[in-house]
């Protein structure tokens, strides 16, 4: 199975929600920390780029699924009796948002500039992906024996190098900014003695180190048992488990729960998702140690790999679920 790049980390970014409501005032009047002031200042811009980043990841996912079906070679891989997925999430709305950013008179930082740099190739890809979506949805390939499929495949391939180049640059800058924001949030929760939320963040950070190591080692369902370094993952797993135990202990303090705007039981879904993620990490490490390869279905199709326990894709999918639950808890906390 050929993939775009080494591996696609299709994960949600930790959403940034305002740590306070209302207008930021001087610390002497409102008790707003330096971290809170910086977070509030960056809130709108960061949330906008979260949406851009997630859109790019969705496009990446669509490209991955398409090329798994059609192949990465110049000649389109004609697979009889099998439907091809060509749902590549480039649309006019996303392009308009990038144009709006480009035409804005606000001062542009590096992240803005990297986002704007994606515009030309996305505009070039839009009519191609629109036509592909219609072509495959209406099964027009049955009428022309895949003649148009080859033409569309060639056009899409011609844009791919540029797309990968500009989106990689954007993702790198965004991820750096995201790490800075997360560090500020962690520091802020620690300063304000929001120990439950702080411990939850720390567990997620340790889990994220495992995700980053998967990316660093370049693992996917086709090769993780041959290439994976189990020792490194074991060390990271130990740190994650310690952070999780600390978090679990903190939510038993009902007084602290109330202080942070939570009720007993609010974290039950998060705990369930976190345990599933931890289990998938554990199985992932065991499979590397035992050289237990992924099934043929998972090797040939990343959709199936996400559901086979212990594959890199399955670990990533379960981490996504942890992040989703974390975001729900933050949203609930912010509303109170």
Regions found by a protein language model. Name each.
Residues 153-277:
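Extended amphipathic alpha-helical interaction segments
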Residues 234-336:
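A cross-kingdom marker for long, charged
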Residues 7-18:
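Hydrophobic membrane-insertion alpha-helices, especially the h-region
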Residues 34-51, 103-106, 110-117, 144, ...:
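Non-transmembrane, amphipathic alpha-helical segments
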Residues 69-71, 95-109, 138-151, 183, ...:
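Short, charged/polar, low-complexity loop and linker segments
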Residues 61-144:
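Post-signal peptide N-terminal segment of secreted/secretory-pathway proteins
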